Amino acid sequence: SNQVNLRVGPDLRYPIEWTYQRRDLPVQIIDEHQLWRRIRDPEGTEGWVQRPLLTSRRSFVVPAGADRVLRRRPEEGAAEVARLRPGVVGRLRKCEAGNPWCEVQAGDYRGWLKRGEIWGVAPDEAVN
């Protein structure tokens, strides 16, 4: 859905605290209650959303600060594919546990970023 309401509690009776209007923004699920999920967004805001409004497709966001360099291969000094500005949202294609690099896609660009340079994947998490 293009609009997702963040509520203060796990029920439609609770007031809406925020309405997200950004598709594929990554969130962290921190609690569950029936058909509701308590989430944390990249800004640290927490609240409840209905589970059917969340997708299992994994995404990332470039946090505030400097541009991130998307590399052709998972190594420092590999050819630059693109520069991703803070706020860019993309798709996590693959992250292997114990590997500092993740294969990602942002728009038409595919390449590799260090997991520490993005928000949306835990330090030792595997994403396939």
List each language-model region with its residue ranges.
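Boundary regions of SH3-family modules and the immediately adjacent low-complexity/disordered segments
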Residues: P10-L12, T19, P26-Q34, R40-E75, ...
